[in-house]
């Protein structure tokens, strides 16, 4: 589905990623962990074409449709949840109100709440970020610290959603300090000192 080949990235001569190789196949769930600043977000941003790599390539199949929750998804702070989700989904002409309402209900967010997103709590914003990453039925999804700010009940909802999506053939990559005990990972990796190391037994 997607292949990362010999990716390197430095910032001001500080090497963050060194010769990163990774293959993601259909229906897999990958877990990447490492210390703060180890390069997890940078790797995701390169794969999602948000920033450029210094060298190396990304190969992906033509039918690969990427969804991602990496830091701020580009929400318009003065607008409502509904406006933001409709706006983001309409960019790629994949707006499906029934699907979005279903996800909002799943995460206990009021789709019709007229309040601006800037007034949302950290946890509510986190839920909105998760929703925008999956609402267009993307088939390859990247989550960077997805459970930050979530309560235990919402973490369980997230874990169940991930397992359900993987069963449906979606591919998911999670970068997190928390392993999320109920997610069924296919492969586990440690990102340390710019190197991505498999921890599969």
Residues covered by each model-derived region:
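Catalytic Walker B motif of ABC-type/P-loop ATPase nucleotide-binding domains
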Residues: 141-145
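The feature captures the beta-strand-to-loop junction immediately N-terminal to the Walker
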Residues: 33-35
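Conserved structural motif at the start of ABC-family nucleotide-binding domains
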Residues: 2-4, 17-19
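Hydrophobic anchor residue at the start of the ABC signature
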Residues: 130
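Helix-to-loop junction immediately C-terminal to a conserved catalytic motif
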Residues: 48
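Q-loop/switch helix immediately C-terminal to the Walker
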Residues: 72, 78-94, 99
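Conserved ABC ATPase "signature" region
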Residues: 97-112
């Amino acid at each position: 589905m997607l292949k990362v080949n010999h990716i390197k990235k430095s910032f001001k001569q500080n090497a963050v990623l060194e010769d990163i190789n990774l293959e993601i196949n259909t229906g897999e769930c990958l877990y990447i962990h490492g210390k703060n600043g180890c390069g997890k977000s940078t790797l995701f941003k390169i794969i999602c074409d948000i920033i450029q790599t210094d060298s190396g390539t990304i190969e992906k199949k033509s039918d690969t449709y990427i969804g991602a929750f990496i830091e701020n998804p580009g929400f318009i702070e003065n607008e409502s949840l509904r406006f933001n989700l409709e706006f983001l989904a309409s960019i790629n002409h994949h707006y499906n109100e029934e699907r979005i309402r279903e996800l909002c209900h799943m995460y206990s967010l009021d789709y019709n709440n007229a309040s601006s997103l800037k007034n949302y709590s950290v946890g509510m914003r986190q839920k909105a970020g998760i929703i925008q990453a999956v609402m267009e039925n993307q088939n390859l999804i990247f989550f960077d610290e997805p459970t930050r700010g979530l309560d235990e009940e919402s973490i369980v909802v997230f874990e169940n959603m991930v397992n359900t999506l993987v069963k449906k053939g979606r591919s998911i990559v999670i970068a997190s300090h928390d392993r999320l005990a109920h997610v069924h990972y296919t492969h586990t990796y440690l990102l340390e000192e710019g190197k991505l190391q498999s921890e599969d037994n």
